Curated annotation (Swiss-Prot):
Gene3D superfamilies per record: Alpha-helical ferredoxin, NagB/RpiA/CoA transferase-like
Any matching Pfam family: Fer4_8
Descriptive protein name: Lactate utilization protein B
Lineage, broadest ranks: Bacteria, Bacillati, Bacillota, Bacilli, Bacillales
Role played: Is involved in L-lactate degradation and allows cells to grow with lactate as the sole carbon source. Has probably a role as an electron transporter during oxidation of L-lactate.
GO terms for biological process, alphabetical: lactate catabolic process
């Protein structure tokens, strides 16, 4: 899988999402639950806004000194016996991982949940050279078995119910029991444990890398990442270049913000800090590789969108977004969905495929208020719109013509008066009572789902003139 998860046009993807009543119900329920849990966890911590400000300061400081901390990380990982590779592009990252697998003559690779490995199409790259890649996160495993893309940053299978999951397991894996979550989890655990023992390589993502120790931090709910890091003889960790913290002190702050913002817990079930195995340690990989991925991030770092790199992938913005609630994650056409996806995806994937995403927002600002590191997401969405219109010249032709006509009419009293007199007659074929019930062209996007007020037959100036004279209108 790559960052792009669908070849459908944006409007078609949105239409599919709106018509999927189960998905909308599941998203609504999950958003409400996660939002409530997040508020409770924040209240328990106390001084939540001060913690947000501290998180923002840590992320901003790290980005301002990213070159220094990356070099420090590289030196410390190397001192501990690990190998570090800086990949400028996603192709370079995938090629390096392929080369490691070839060198090890690996046939089976087990991995934990990682957005950046999806971004670089790692699974596909390994499958090209004959490796079997197994997802160990339960949600990702369900999607892998069903060949279905993720719809949420932290809950990838959110759009499926347990009956659908049972049917997938029955059809693809020969599962014969009920749709009880415990029974299905037990079944998957048995499937995965057998594969863990046979895997030559384990691949993980990285929530945060600690510069001054050369350590990596992984946060999971299932403990699968611990097995991925400890059982296979070779471990490959893949991280976006921005996922840095200077020391363990900053890590402590950001992990607390991440867990509370993502799932409303003080800590998730497993927070693991690890790296290359040391002499005194009894388990862990014999060989460790860290792949640091740029893939456009250095350009973002030097742009007006820099603050998006503060993201800690908690999905708090997704969990409060009213647009995501109604259209779901697949509508974004990217592994990165919700407000953060609408900002980040066009920067990584370009406007040609993702120019609609910055407009998939009501600009209500709920995402900005929810972000634990205070990324001004709704402002960044507006900046995207400005770039699309002014720098790229990508405003739709119909919109350009409409704005040009409005500009001409609004700047001429005579044209404005003539237009206001003609409007009622021009719209009468589409009017029922005092509402526009159907539209043509761009108006259909509005009138197909809501009523539009019909133009008044009486101009305001005429009404005001009569009212001022004491008329009874």
């Amino acid at each position: 899988m790559s960052m792009k998860i669908s070849e459908k046009k944006f409007n078609d993807r949105v239409g599919d999402g709106i018509q999927d009543s189960f998905m909308r119900g599941a998203v609504s329920s999950a958003q409400t639950r996660l939002y409530t849990n997040r508020l409770k966890a924040a209240d328990e911590l106390g001084n939540w806004e001060e913690w947000r400000e501290l998180g923002e300061q840590i992320r901003q400081h790290t980005l301002e000194n990213l070159d220094y901390y990356l070099m420090q990380l590289s030196e410390n990982v190397s001192k501990r016996g690990g190998h570090v590779y800086f990949a400028k592009t996603k192709e370079e990252a995938a090629k390096y991982i392929q080369d490691v697998a070839k060198k090890k003559q690996a046939k089976k690779v087990v991995k934990s949940k990682s957005m950046v490995t999806e971004e670089i199409s790692m699974n596909h790259a390994l499958e090209e050279i004959g490796c079997e890649v197994l997802e160990s996160d339960l949600g990702e495993y369900i999607l892998q078995v069903d060949n279905d893309p993720p719809s949420h940053i932290i809950a990838p299978a959110l759009h499926k119910n347990r009956t659908q999951i049972r049917d997938v397991f029955k059809e693809k894996l020969g599962y014969e029991n009920s749709d009880d979550p415990y029974e299905m989890t037990k079944f998957v655990r048995k499937q995965l444990r057998e594969k863990f023992m046979d895997a030559e390589i384990g691949v993980t993502g990285c929530n945060f890398a600690v510069a001054n120790t050369g350590s990596l931090c992984l946060v999971t709910n299932e403990g699968n990442a611990d097995l991925v890091m400890s059982i296979p003889k070779t471990q490959i960790a893949v991280m976006g270049m921005e996922r840095m913290v200077p020391t363990m002190e900053e890590l402590d702050v950001l992990v607390g913000l991440l867990c509370r913002s993502a799932v409303g817990q003080k800590l998730t079930s497993y927070v693991t800090v690890a790296g290359p195995i040391q002499e005194e340690e009894v388990d862990g990989p014999e060989e460790f590789h860290l792949v640091v991925v740029d893939n456009g991030r250095s350009q973002i770092l030097g742009s007006e969108f820099r603050s998006v790199l503060q993201c800690i992938r908690c999905a708090a913005c997704v969990n409060v977004c009213p647009v995501y609630r109604h259209v779901g994650g697949h509508s974004y056409g990217s592994i990165y969905s919700g407000p953060i996806g609408a900002v980040l995806t066009p920067l990584l994937g370009g406007y040609d495929d993702y120019k609609e995403l910055p407009y998939a927002s009501s600009l209500c600002g709920a995402c900005t208020e929810a972000c634990p590191v205070k990324i001004p997401l709704h402002d960044l969405l507006l900046k995207h719109r400005q770039v699309i219109v002014e720098q790229e010249g990508r405003a739709p032709l119909a919109e350009k013509l409409a704005m040009k006509m409005f500009s001409m009419g609004a700047s001429s009293a005579a044209l404005y008066k003539m237009g206001s007199k003609m409007a009622p007659a021009a719209m009468s074929p589409f009017t029922s009572g005092n509402r526009v019930s159907k539209g043509v062209g761009p108006l259909k996007n509005w009138t197909d789902i809501r009523e539009f007020p019909a133009p008044s037959k009486e101009r305001f100036r005429d009404w005001y003139k009569d009212h001022k004279k004491g008329g009874d209108k």
